[in-house]
Curated annotation (Swiss-Prot):
Its EC number is 6.2.1.5. It is an enzyme of class 6 (ligase). Pfam families: ATP-grasp_2, Ligase_CoA. One of its GO terms (molecular function) is ATP binding. It comes from the Bacteria. Substrate binds at N258, G315, I316, T317. It comes from Deinococcus radiodurans (strain ATCC 13939 / DSM 20539 / JCM 16871 / CCUG 27074 / LMG 4051 / NBRC 15346 / NCIMB 9279 / VKM B-1422 / R1). Keywords: ATP-binding, Ligase, Magnesium, Metal-binding, Nucleotide-binding, Tricarboxylic acid cycle. This is Succinate--CoA ligase [ADP-forming] subunit beta. It catalyses: succinate + ATP + CoA = succinyl-CoA + ADP + phosphate; GTP + succinate + CoA = succinyl-CoA + GDP + phosphate. Mg(2+) binds at N192, D206.
């Protein structure tokens, strides 16, 4: 479960992290009232569960009351990557030039089968950009989930990352952040920027906090944070179906497979083919025709999807059940986008016979996933994909 910035700050504050105060508003008039209360320049920040809010115009500095009101009117109700902004966080503006911005974060790192603490002196930037252009500027440190991050480890990481200021206070914030991540079963926690003021005091100006959905039964006190209206509607619908589904930004090829490993590999081959996957969708093992039908229906609803790549290796999943689900979606007029399939394994021959008998121009099968990915990418790009 993703938390809004203000919610993530509330969780971190409970663990003793020094976070920037702010107030939530749902109307321009409320923003105006908050500005009057603060009596100084503010920043109006869209609260949506996607990255790139600033680039999309969802974060605005407001030097005066009129500007705060204008920015609130522009941001509230705007669409950011398919999500409508229904609320904003209003914070006091900080003079960034009077201090230094850093980045710290904790992720579940499957490569080391543990948590990894990340720190960088390149704060205020998207960490993905830093990882792509200057990966050496990100310091990584494995955190033992039993002992947690110890103060001396945090200080060592801060020094290696080139942090300046009161290193004991910075290390203390990192320790408290890691404790929040561990105790709240987070898969991701970020403080970006971690602002160190002229006195060397660290302040969390912006945060990301995401809790493992499978652990939410342990955190029922946070269940009220979930807002279906703030989540992507396709992800909400997928949850109703019981699918493992993630909407991906800027994609043009819908991806459907059986098993997380196959789906992850499929994302890679789509990228290699010159397109971008629009989603992650795992139908699971043993999926029947109705499950496949619902999965195809879900992916077809995404306007970003220009072509669909179905990658199936049948074990307990029968390929003919997959074919029946696809054919049903076609017969009902739900499937209107090109489908490129690689289908193999249990009942492969039966599946191919069903699809060949249907003889639809929309559906084509290929012997390898690389060929299918290349054809799906060609179709998507030719049809105006991103």
């Amino acid at each position: 479960m993703k938390l809004h910035e203000y919610q993530g700050k509330e969780v971190l504050r409970d663990f003793g992290v020094n976070v920037q105060d702010g107030k939530v508003a749902t109307t321009p008039e409320e923003v105006q009232a908050i500005y009057k209360e603060y009596g100084q320049p503010v920043v109006v920040k869209a609260q949506v569960h996607v990255g790139g809010r600033g680039k999309a115009g969802g974060v605005k500095y407001s030097a005066n009351e009129d500007k705060a009101l204008e920015n609130a009117k522009n941001i509230l109700g705007m669409d950011i990557k398919g999500l409508t902004v229904n609320k904003v966080l209003v914070t006091k503006a900080v003079d960034i030039d009077a201090g230094t911005e850093y980045y710290v974060g904790m992720i579940v790192d499957r490569n080391v089968q543990s948590y990894t603490l990340m720190a960088s002196a390149e704060g205020g930037m998207e960490i993905e950009e830093v990882a792509a252009t200057n990966p050496e500027k990100i310091i990584r440190h494995r955190v033992d989930p039993v002992t947690g991050l110890r103060p001396y480890e945090a200080r060592e990481v801060a020094i290696k990352a080139g942090f300046r200021g009161n290193l004991n206070k910075i290390a203390d914030m990192m320790v408290k952040m890691s404790k929040a991540a561990l105790e709240r079963d987070a898969v991701l926690v970020e403080i970006n920027p971690l602002f160190v003021d002229a006195d060397g005091t660290p302040i969390a100006l912006d945060t990301k906090f995401e809790i493992d959905d499978n652990a939410m039964y342990r955190h029922k006190d946070l269940a009220h944070y979930r807002e279906l209206s703030a989540e992507h509607p396709l992800e909400v619908e997928a949850s109703d179906y019981g699918f493992a589904y993630v909407k991906l930004d800027d994609g043009n090829v819908g991806v459907l497979g059986n098993g997380a490993g196959i789906v992850m590999t499929t994302l890679d081959v789509v990228n290699r083919a010159g397109a971008k996957p629009a989603n992650f969708l795992d139908i699971g093992g043993g999926a029947k025709a109705d499950v496949v039908y619902n999965a195809v229906k879900l992916v077809s609803k995404d306007p970003d999807v220009k072509a669909i790549f179905i990658n199936i290796f049948g074990g307990i999943t029968r390929a003919d059940e997959v074919a029946k689900g696809v054919i049903r979606a076609l017969d009902e007029g739900i499937l209107t986008k090109p489908v490129r399939m690689r289908i193999a394994g249990t009942a492969e021959d039966e599946a191919k016979a069903l699809l060949n008998e249907k003889n639809s121009d929309l559906i084509k099968m290929y012997p390898t996933m690389f060929e299918a990915a290349n054809e799906a990418a060609k179709e998507a790009n030719a049809l105006g994909g991103k």
